């Protein structure tokens, strides 16, 4: 708390006054990070976009967000080390994820009605898969580079992974 207070140019007592505890402060930080992601996702208007292009734009948007905001992934990784202790205590975070899943559900439904997408696609599971494809490369970029000698934060590598991940998602979605 002392380091946080110094960086915020305040004192520990003020932090405890506003947040109550280290745990409540961390929960507030998580909620803030997820709110920023949700606000960014809300700005993405995919209503009139063809379903295949809408899924592609949503995926690229999320993956680019992760790349531009690796602090979100660090927070989530830290939370996973704590077995989601703080997220479990926050109803707000669960509520924040719902709008993008609802947006994706509408896109999937439009694609199904157009005869493009399979009918048995669960929006939440698809979102988790979509998210995971972008998450892994950003979250693990340092160990991937050390292990394989490839810098996945470099534009050329990133573009190749995005292309492959997009093809994977669409291959799963498309009616066979």
Predicted regions, residues:
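C-terminal peripheral helix-coil segments that are non-catalytic and often amphipathic
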Residues: 61-64, 68, 98-114, 132-176
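Generic alpha-helical structural context detector
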Residues: 27, 31, 35, 64, ...
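All-alpha amphipathic helical-bundle segments outside canonical DNA-binding/catalytic cores
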Residues: 53, 92-96, 113-129
């Amino acid at each position: 708390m002392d380091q946080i207070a110094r960086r915020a140019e305040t004192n520990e007592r003020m932090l405890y006054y506003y947040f109550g505890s280290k745990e409540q402060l961390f929960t507030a930080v998580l909620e803030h990070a997820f709110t920023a992601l949700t606000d960014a996702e809300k700005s993405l208007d995919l209503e009139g976009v063809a379903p295949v292009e809408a899924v592609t734009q949503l995926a690229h948007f999320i993956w680019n967000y992760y790349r531009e905001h690796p602090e979100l992934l660090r927070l989530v990784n830290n939370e996973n080390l704590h077995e989601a202790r703080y997220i479990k205590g926050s109803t707000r975070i669960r509520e924040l994820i719902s709008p993008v899943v609802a947006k994706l559900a509408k896109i999937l439904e439009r694609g199904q009605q157009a005869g493009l997408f399979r009918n048995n696609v669960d929006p939440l599971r698809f979102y988790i898969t979509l998210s995971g494809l972008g998450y892994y490369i950003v979250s693990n970029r340092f160990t991937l580079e050390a292990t394989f000698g490839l810098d996945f934060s470099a534009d050329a590598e990133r573009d190749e992974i995005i292309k492959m991940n997009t093809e994977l998602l669409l291959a799963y979605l498309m009616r066979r």
